Amino acid sequence: MAGVAGWWADREELYRDGGAVAARAISHGGAQGDLLASFGRDSEWGPNHACAARFLRAFGSGDMDAARREMTADCVFEATGPAPDGVRHEGADAAHSVWTQMFAETTNPLFSTEEQFVAGDRAVVRWSYSWTDDQGAPGHIRGVDVIRFRDGLICEKLSYVKG
């Protein structure tokens, strides 16, 4: 570790000025954390962070097959409606079916991640979902997903909408 850190210390400014590495991240301590932070990497990044990133990218592009690959087979999805509790869907295939239908039956659907936070086996995602209605007028909702991970995959996705 010391050898790599020493080599990097001599070259960091050159790489940073050239745009080859991101701005320094916050170090979470230790030699490895310090080195990763100097590269702009979060030493706390792990399988759950990666799963969330892949899932949100897939959902944002409407690729429900890719989204399903980021869920456990027994994943639970609680939809935002109908009020007051939404509908509970059990299993990745059931969630996939709901989402595929939603994207297929909506004109110009767009799911956008506004913010995400992953800590341990939990994540919170603030999002917006927009569409065009039958008269051509735009519409949107904003909401939050509370996510739980198991073995680096989503095992629970509870969705809530501002209303």
Predicted regions located by residue number:
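A beta-strand edge to alpha-helix "cap/lid" segment located at domain peripheries
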Residues: 1-47, 96-163
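Conserved aromatic
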Residues: 7-8, 61, 89
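Residue-level detector of alpha-helix boundaries and kinks
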Residues: 37-40, 52, 80-84, 132
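Short acidic-aromatic low-complexity motifs
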Residues: 40-74
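Secondary-structure boundary/capping motif
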Residues: 49, 54-58, 72, 92, ...
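Hydrophobic alpha-helical core bundles mediating ligand binding, dimerization, or RNAP-core interactions
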Residues: 52, 59, 71, 95, ...
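A solvent-exposed, acidic/Ser-Thr-rich amphipathic alpha-helical stretch
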Residues: 66-120
